[in-house]
């Protein structure tokens, strides 16, 4: 994963630590630990919803309806805060982080931007492409992203990068599909 995506994740973590209050102090510890450890942060993916067979750290803002903090994979869950911190600190694992906000009706635009950046730069994008359906963006931003993707698709062809071409094409198709669906709902 590239250094700019790591910096974007670090900035996002700083942003949420500064602007939100979490139910568990261990959440703050884990986020600060991940922010300071680039190798760990490289394996972190922020998500909108849990994905089967992925380790998922669920964290909750004060007044959210979800549990304060929980680490789960398949049918196994950890709720002991010290156990969660130690597990993350002492294991090398791909970790999804799902944030439960108190006001679930308002989207956090910085999270949406991060999700999009992760999709564009992550080789494991296909596991997360469904998150595109839940991010919000206005028409102007969506048009800009589509144009940028099209330019990068052209560039990937010129650079003879078929995997990146395929990745960007899939993301572009989902964005266009999302646009068509939202247009149908508006009618």
Swiss-Prot record:
Name of the molecule in the record: UPF0302 protein SERP1032
Pfam families named in the record: IDEAL, UPF0302
Database matches in InterPro entries: IDEAL_dom, UPF0302, UPF0302_N, UPF0302_N_sf
Family: Belongs to the UPF0302 family.
TM helices/strands, residue ranges: none
């Amino acid at each position: 994963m590239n250094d700019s995506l790591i910096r974007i994740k670090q900035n996002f973590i700083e942003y949420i630590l500064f602007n939100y209050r979490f139910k568990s102090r261990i959440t703050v510890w884990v986020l600060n630990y991940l922010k300071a450890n680039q190798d760990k942060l490289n394996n972190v993916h922020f998500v909108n919803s849990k994905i089967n067979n992925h380790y998922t750290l669920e964290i909750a803002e004060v007044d959210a309806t979800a549990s304060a903090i929980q680490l789960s994979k398949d049918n196994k869950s950890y709720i002991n805060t010290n156990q969660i911190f130690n597990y993350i600190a002492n294991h090398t694992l791909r970790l999804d982080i799902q944030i439960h906000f108190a006001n679930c009706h308002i989207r956090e635009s910085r999270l949406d931007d991060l999700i999009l950046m992760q999709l564009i730069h992550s080789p494991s994008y296909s596991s997360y492409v469904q998150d595109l359906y839940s991010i919000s963006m206005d028409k102007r931003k969506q048009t800009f992203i589509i144009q940028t993707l099209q330019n990068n698709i052209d560039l990937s062809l010129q650079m003879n990068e078929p995997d990146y071409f395929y990745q960007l094409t899939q993301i572009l198709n989902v964005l266009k599909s999302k646009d068509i669906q939202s247009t149908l709902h508006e009618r």
